[in-house]
Curated annotation (Swiss-Prot):
The gene is hemH. Belongs to the ferrochelatase family. It comes from Rhodopseudomonas palustris (strain BisA53). One of its GO terms (cellular component) is cytoplasm. InterPro entries: Ferrochelatase, Ferrochelatase_AS, Ferrochelatase_C, Ferrochelatase_N. It is found in: Cytoplasm. GO terms for biological process: heme biosynthetic process. Its EC number is 4.98.1.1. Catalyzes the ferrous insertion into protoporphyrin IX. Keywords: Cytoplasm, Heme biosynthesis, Iron, Lyase, Metal-binding, Porphyrin biosynthesis. This is Ferrochelatase. Fe cation binds at residues 215, 296.
Amino acid sequence: MTVIVPIHSPAVAPAPAPERVGVLLVNLGTPDSCDTKGVRIYLREFLSDPRVIENQGLFWKLALNGLILQTRPARKAKDYQKIWNHEKNESPLKTITRAQAHKLATSLSDRGHLVVDWAMRYGNPSMRSRIEAMVAKGCSRLLVVPLYPQYSAATSATVCDQAFRVLSELRAQPTMRVAPPYFRDSAYIDALANSIRSHLASLPFEPEIIVASFHGMPQAYIEKGDPYQAQCIATVDALRERMGLGDNKLLLTFQSRFGFDEWLQPYTDQTIQKLANDGVKRLAVVMPGFASDCLETLEEIAQENAETFLHNGGEHFSAVPCLNDSDGGIAVIRQLVLRELQGWL
């Protein structure tokens, strides 16, 4: 009797996709809509991050899910509505970050195996969705670029946390690098100086003083070792030197304080009000810590603080746009990316 034994061929793994290198630009985040519900969803994710609010104890959770998320979203929704890109139905931060990624990709188009994408740390498009998409496109190496010139645990570090969290759930992990802060890179300082000069040249007045306003943070975070304040100071020192301005002509301040703790000082709003009260009539504000214009620049500075200045005796106020997707801004990101991709291209 003849016995026929079927022979099973071993499973053949699919051929790997062509190897690519991914570059992921990451910005802070934005609500998906400018109504109360959309802002509440965004704020819950943002304020639940222990890198942002380090004390996530019971008292904070009760406060967050009680008073804060019941009252703050409606107020913030009104602020977002003032600056919302209604044509695209999205915040300016999303519009600009997308444009930055698109222009960066165009500037690197001669590197055929590069994939450039963008994500938000909070909100959409999420880092998880974009990292998974880049891996699916064959990216075996990934450069994550936090769009923060100055490092802070509340910004840059939480981007790293989330990137590693996503990688921890992947079987086939890409090799990953994270771009460092660029707070005193010559390309960044040059771009800031050129942007300020160009903007001031377009104004019908000459500012008596320029205020360099950075996002604030609790003083306690600095005392725990966060280098953010020192890097902000280094940026302004370099900018003063590049522009030939003394420390009485280019001031350093911190904005956007939240809660009752002491934050980095001097505070931007108080400084602007005092300048007006002291007789300063012409003022410009630049925000070097923001790679892209957003709620904090377009509404808080260009509207709220402008109103404060004008209502207290000031006569002329101008907010200098962030570098955004300008040629200078893209050149800064491009140089950073090419430097950090050395050995991979």
